[in-house]
């Protein structure tokens, strides 16, 4: 966790999206990187991790990109339901799917790109777009990735 007092401010014009109060802390431990397993402190996660075939692995396990996609889609959907409820809309039947891609970046490391596909079948498209925009401002994953990785949101 970052010591907020140690973070310099002023030069960056982006809004401060750091939490003012930590409500929950998740804890997970990786053993063996992309060829091992991961566990959560509470025992809810105990998964084998493997490189996907597209990256030269056997695909016999989950991978960080799948876990990121699961986390982002779940978090964004929760933010969408929250802003919908605040605006008086019932979003029953809505879904959010995430695709997370990984590839080399210009700094000789690796980067991610995300595509979120949002389905709001019973909501007018104009209203749906406003709800999606509002959810993108509320979602912790969106706040964490903003101006850092490419995130495309498709409304269908």
Question: Whereabouts are the PLM-identified features?
Answer:
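Extended beta-strand/beta-hairpin segments
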Residues: 2-70, 77-156
């Amino acid at each position: 966790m970052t010591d907020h007092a140690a973070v310099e401010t002023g030069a960056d014009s982006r809004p401060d999206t750091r939490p003012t109060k930590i409500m929950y802390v998740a804890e997970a431990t990786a053993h063996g990187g992309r060829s091992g397993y991961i566990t959560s402190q509470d025992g809810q996660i105990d998964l084998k991790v493997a490189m996907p075939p597209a990256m030269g692995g056997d695909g016999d396990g989950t991978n960080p990109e799948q876990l990121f996609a699961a986390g982002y889609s779940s978090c964004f959907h929760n933010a969408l339901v929250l802003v919908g409820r605040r605006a008086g809309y019932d979003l029953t039947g809505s879904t959010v799917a995430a695709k997370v891609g990984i590839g080399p970046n210009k700094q000789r490391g690796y980067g991610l790109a995300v595509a979120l596909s949002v389905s709001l079948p019973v909501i007018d498209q104009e209203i749906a777009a406003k709800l999606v925009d509002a959810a993108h401002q509320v979602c912790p994953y969106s706040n964490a990735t903003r101006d850092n990785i490419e995130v495309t949101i498709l409304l269908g």
